[in-house]
């Protein structure tokens, strides 16, 4: 299977370097250099992963992410020279699934891409292994093959990481998961900023269920988080 990757960056040289590095690993790569408003959502559909630069002249990558997140669940890796913990947490909080800071090596870039794609494949494979395609928990329904969550038939626009966290908690509704448990399930590497992002993801999940007067995640003080049906 050939995986399709979209790179969005207004620096032509960086686009060329990233495109070449990924094509050498047999990825099919498309690029966008001059993104501007209004966005055409079809420009971002049909890909297995998106690499999105944050600091661009016409529109920031964070704004692009906010505008397309309700329409696509494709993993998004932010690429940016903004490298503080708060920058990373903010990027993940508005819909990013991972973050790579400039300057970076092409080996690091490829490793990030491969880790995210492998995780998506493992998640899809797990559904088939356990032969569960639907999970009903009160008004909340998981469509596991589609990696989609609905409340009374209405789809909740979760990012890949948000879905992973919520689905993990729903597997064993009586278990309390520590932040370490959740982190180990959704990330393949350690980073303090990524670890801190777990709380932000929990906040974003809750905010997306709030219009339905549902809070699917209970905080167990001093321990962690638990499914709250």
From Swiss-Prot:
**Residue ranges flagged as DNA-binding region:** 132-229
Q: What does this protein do?
A: Member of the two-component regulatory system NisK/NisR involved in the regulation of the biosynthesis of lantibiotic nisin. NisR may function as a regulatory protein.
Q: Keywords, A to Z? A: Activator, DNA-binding, Phosphoprotein, Transcription, Transcription regulation, Two-component regulatory system
Record bears the keyword Ribonucleoprotein: no
Q: Which InterPro entries match?
A: CheY-like_superfamily, OmpR/PhoB-type_DNA-bd, Sig_transdc_resp-reg_receiver, WalR-like, WH-like_DNA-bd_sf
Q: What is this protein called?
A: Nisin biosynthesis regulatory protein NisR
Q: PROSITE patterns under this entry?
A: OMPR_PHOB (PS51755), RESPONSE_REGULATORY (PS50110)
Superkingdom field: Bacteria
Question: What Gene Ontology cellular-component terms does the record carry?
Answer: cytosol; protein-DNA complex
This chain's source organism reads Lactococcus lactis subsp. lactis
């Amino acid at each position: 299977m050939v995986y399709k990757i979209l790179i969005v960056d207004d620096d032509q040289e960086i686009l060329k370097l990233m495109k070449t590095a990924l094509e050498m690993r047999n990825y099919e790569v498309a690029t966008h250099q001059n993104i501007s408003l209004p966005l055409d959502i079809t420009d971002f559909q049909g890909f297995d992963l998106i690499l999105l630069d944050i600091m661009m002249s016409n529109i920031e990558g964070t704004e692009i992410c906010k505008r397309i997140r309700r329409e696509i669940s494709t993993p998004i890796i932010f690429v940016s020279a903004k490298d503080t913990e708060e920058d990373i947490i903010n990027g993940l909080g508005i819909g990013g699934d991972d973050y790579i800071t400039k300057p970076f090596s092409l080996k690091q870039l490829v490793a990030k891409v491969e880790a995210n794609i492998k995780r998506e494949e493992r998640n899809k494979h797990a559904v088939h292994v356990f032969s569960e395609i639907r999970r009903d928990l009160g008004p909340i329904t998981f469509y596991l093959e589609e990696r989609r969550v609905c409340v009374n038939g209405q789809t909740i626009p979760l990012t890949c990481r948000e879905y992973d966290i919520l689905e993990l908690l729903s597997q064993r509704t009586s278990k309390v998961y520590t932040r370490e448990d959740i982190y180990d399930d959704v990330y393949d590497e350690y980073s303090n900023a990524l670890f801190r992002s777990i709380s932000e993801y929990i906040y974003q999940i809750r905010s997306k269920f709030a219009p339905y007067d549902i809070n699917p995640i209970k905080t167990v003080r001093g321990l962690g988080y638990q499914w709250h049906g």
